UniProtKB/Swiss-Prot annotation:
Lineage of origin: Bacteria, Pseudomonadati, Planctomycetota, Planctomycetia, Pirellulales
Organism from which the protein derives: Rhodopirellula baltica (strain DSM 10527 / NCIMB 13988 / SH1)
Residue numbers binding [4Fe-4S] cluster: C110, C114, C117
GO molecular function term, any single one: RNA methyltransferase activity
A biological process term (GO) from this entry: tRNA methylation
Identification of the protein by name: Probable RNA methyltransferase RB6963
EC number: 2.1.1.-
Superkingdom in the source lineage: Bacteria
Amino acid sequence: MTAAPASVRLFQTHEMEALRRDRRLDPQVFRKLRNDLLKKFESDEAVLEKYPVAEAIELHSLKLYQRMDSEIDGATKLLFETESGMLIESVILRIATGRTTLCVSSQIGCAAACDFCATGKMGIAKNLATEEILDQVVQAGQILRGEDRRLSNIVFMGMGEPLHNEVNVTEAIELLTAPDHFARSPSTVLVSTVGVPAGMLRLAKRFPNLNLALSLHSADQTTREKIIPLGKKASLAQLHDAIHEIQTIQDREFMIEYLMLRDVNDSAKDADRLIDWIGDLRVHVNLIPYNTIEASPHLHASSRPVIESFADILKASGLKTTVRYSLGNDIEAACGQLIRQENRQRAMQARRTESESDSHVGFLDVRQVVDGLESQKNK
């Protein structure tokens, strides 16, 4: 029999089983522990008091480095430090309807290099481990339990391209929806991507009730490639075909995200292109006001009247359309704003001290939660 290590990691099944056998514990002990921590989000103190064996378990893989609460709305930015010493961010969004959404990161930095995105400007991605993705959920859930609030939705719309970390993101979703772990419905989870057709299809097949979103931002191939360099790898036709195939698997609307950029993609002609591209796909379009970033001074936000006019054109064609406005502007939690000088410095230090190529990482972006996610649950 393999002896249990001095401390074991919460989401490592083999390590946990070795610990159980080493301590000769009833299998129900760990079932109850996971139930209290992952479903009820009880505090560490409560878990340690109820289960002395928890002292031998690493309950968290992330260290909460800083918390910032918005003074103007219900957003909270959580800054976590990873074991590698780099920083990631999650955002809690307390919606006026009473729903609460957590926006999680899947990578440190991002390789997609979107022109409008702070993260994309700042470096090559380093994948977060499955346990680092899940610990964002655990720690946010514990905060919300203290407020007597429930976590309604989890969206992979934070830092990084989830489908560039497909293995760990998929495993995280497996555990989020596993009855013996978080036991969440897949319909409460959303994954947003800039467009990786094969990965989108794999997720849809594995989780038919999972919500998926595409960061489209233009229905003109040339324009999209300018603002999303990764668009060169997957054409608009390929993305349309992927969504069409996904909708033969999933009986639900597909989310389309469209960032409104002045004189780039916000004309009536752009709206008509979008309508034509969507065609007979069952989608919900979310129009997103742009938050300016220093690294892209040539990009500007569309005016509110232009956004509303664009929305009217889409609605007149029969498309479900929502204009979304930011939460957390005062704490830099809104789309494209999550950048920290400290992480720049840590990334520079990592470049000097680490030899592995995947250490060249860095910066943070959280996109706003997609409106309409709640309406998908029972479809």
